[in-house]
Amino acid sequence: MSSGGLLLLLGLLTLWEGLTPVSSKDRPHFCHLPHDPGPCKGNFQAFYYHPVRRTCLEFIYGGCQGNPNNFKTIDECKRTCAA
């Protein structure tokens, strides 16, 4: 195979890897934790990954404690857990 063909193949494989969804075993463990608003009484929009629905959902975060399945934006949640 020519060097141009090898470069094309390498590029296609790289693209394929970027487009392939993350399997549940490759997701960070905290993506499987339930959403946790924490004990504080704040009212902050946040997002968490719902592993059964396999999507990110909105919830109200109290502002303290909680757990790592807590994202400021839906895009951050999707990049981390639903990609």
Swiss-Prot record:
Disulfide bonds: 31-81, 40-64, 56-77
Listed GO MF terms: serine-type endopeptidase inhibitor activity; toxin activity
Positions bearing the site annotation: Reactive bond for trypsin: 41-42
One Pfam match: Kunitz_BPTI
Domain of life of the source: Eukaryota
Boundaries of every BPTI/Kunitz inhibitor domain copy: 31-81
Gene3D superfamilies associated with the record: Pancreatic trypsin inhibitor Kunitz domain (4.10.410.10)
Keyword rRNA processing appears in the UniProt entry: no
Tissues expressing this chain: Expressed by the venom gland.
PROSITE patterns: BPTI_KUNITZ_1, BPTI_KUNITZ_2
Similarity remark: Belongs to the venom Kunitz-type family.
Protein name as annotated: Kunitz serine protease inhibitor Pr-mulgin 2
Lineage: Eukaryota, Metazoa, Chordata, Craniata, Vertebrata
